[in-house]
Amino acid sequence: MSDSPEKTNSECSHEIAAMMGVHALYWKIEEQADQINLDPPLSKQERHLLVSLATPKRMGVLAREMASLPSSVTVIVDSLEAKDFIRRTRDPDDRRAYQLELTESGQIGRKALVEKAGKLFRQISGLNSIEIETFAQLASKAREKALESGIPEGMKK
């Protein structure tokens, strides 16, 4: 068997080739993810939460969308709130509850993170706009199915 990725992918099923591709893509992005940061610097979890908060959301909803435990989200929220990226406001639909929303700094930071992450993804993946759209649809479908049975242990950290 050859060490060539092309040769390896042609010798296995589409399912295995897909898993190998996603695995390599994940680790290459993980390796370079710290290039995507702001001032003040944010942790990986803080960046993930900031990007996930496109619109105001309750913490439970955000935890579910991020496939994280609510207690983990609370710690991240406290940190981002201290850095003036997010704020807690009363939920207009339920005055007993709070929701999270981006501050002006948070909106600017989120926009910068999304742009930098998109550029990094295009560079690493080599996919064009149409391929990215198709990949995003397929990956979202696979993610939804994968999370039906609960949050994988590795995502809880």
What is the role of each PLM region?
Residues 25-36, 66, 109-131, 142-153:
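Alpha-helical linker/hinge and terminal dimerization helices associated
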Residues 31-72:
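N-terminal helix-turn-helix DNA-binding core of bacterial DNA-binding proteins
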Residues 79-137:
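Charged, amphipathic alpha-helical coiled-coil/dimerization segments
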Residues 1-40:
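N-terminal leader segment of winged-helix/HTH proteins
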Residues 1-12, 130-157:
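C-terminal regulatory/oligomerization modules of transcriptional regulators
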